[in-house]
Amino acid sequence: MRLYFITFCLLLITLVSCKENNTAKTIKLAHGLGVSHPVHKAMVYMADRVEENSGGKLKLEIYPSSQLGSERQCLELLQIGSLGMTKVSAAVMENFSPDLRVFGYPYLFRNNEHRFKVYDGEIGQKLLLDGEKFWLHGLTYFDAGNRSFYTKNHPIHKPEDLKGLKIRVMQSPTAINLVKSLGAAPTPISWGELYTALQQGVVDGAENNLPSFYTSKHYEVCKYFTVNEHSSVPDILVISTIIWNDLSSEEKKWINDAAQDATVYQRKLWHESEEEALQAIEKAGVEVYYPDKSLFEKESSGMIKSLKTEDKELYDLVQEIENVK
């Protein structure tokens, strides 16, 4: 029912947009992050570049903070062409494009340089377009850093400390299996509902990157952050193929060029925001721990090993990524 209501609202927005400006083409972009998040700022930057590149002929209209629905709902709206663009985690996209689940596997990348080489190289670009058969055209990867655990009642020093804890995860089978492999009880909850879930004790903690932990104000509830960096799942900027196929080659170039500019800008912003977030949460009284990551890597290593017999194709993809120099 909510999806129908959102679709109806989007149709009204479209009608209003057409009346206000019958010369410029407007594409609606919705996402679930707050306006202070570096990824939102990068999308605003991209919108400015699109308008500049097109001389005002093409515009992006941004709806942040889950105004038009959850990540999953936004993807479904893209599939029917009721929404133009969205930003989602690759973990959510894996429900539509299964190979993207590779990014959710633990300790896949050696470092940030390795990660960006994969995103920007042949492997990453192939995966980016893998959702086209589901009417989802990937434009670029936005950096989402490394995911770590944060909790309410006690710190996490080693995997054993997670046992029995209810940890919020994304709607992703891979994320669920990873947290389960470390002994915790994975609990899928939408991002917009997580603050309340933490407050009310529905979950004992969650896992995410530092900037998201800070901008969501989860530090007000969770006073322990463990930098174990178990996975590095990028965000993906996606456009509906229904909308994409209706654009001229010139309009596609305006968008692609702006997306690439925004990617460079976003990575710079992300690096700065990680440092700012760390300082801010420590000032707010959060205890930050740097555990021996090898303990978490060893405990979760069975996930990749099991692929050799359970999913040879995905195992080969993991090997390809690990071999990128």
Segments predicted by a language model, with ranges:
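Short, low-complexity disordered leader/linker segments with a strong preference
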Residues: 1-26
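N-terminal secretory/targeting leader peptides
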Residues: 18-114, 123, 131-325
